């Protein structure tokens, strides 16, 4: 995930935006940090999904075909 100091800075800029407003440089920094956060979140979510197997109540593997193909591409 994203470094703690970057998350703290995102929160700090968000609070400042609500109270006093942001300068152009701060708005640019906030947008950049948010893009980094979203990118890191998506990567973590994708990595997590590549470890998932869906099993129905009968014990059958019902993992979606698209996910199985993605898992095969990633691990082979």
Curated annotation (Swiss-Prot):
Residues 63-76 have a biased composition (Basic and acidic residues). GO terms for cellular component: cytoplasm. The keyword Cytoplasm applies. Keywords: Cytoplasm. SUPFAM superfamilies: YnzC-like. InterPro entries: DUF896 (IPR009242). The keyword Oxidoreductase does not apply. Its main location: cytoplasm. It is found in: Cytoplasm. Gene3D superfamilies: Helix hairpin bin. Residues 57-76 are annotated as: Disordered. PANTHER family: UPF0291 PROTEIN CBO2609/CLC_2481, UPF0291 PROTEIN YNZC. HAMAP family: UPF0291. Belongs to the UPF0291 family. This is UPF0291 protein GK1331. It comes from Geobacillus kaustophilus (strain HTA426).
């Amino acid at each position: 995930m994203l470094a703690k100091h970057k998350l703290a800075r995102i929160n700090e800029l968000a609070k400042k935006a609500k109270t006093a407003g942001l300068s152009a440089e701060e708005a640019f920094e906030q947008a950049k940090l948010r893009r980094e956060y979203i990118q890191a979140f998506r990567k973590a979510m994708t990595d997590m999904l590549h470890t998932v197997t869906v099993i129905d109540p009968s014990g059958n593997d019902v993992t979606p075909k698209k996910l199985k193909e993605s898992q095969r591409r990633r691990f082979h």
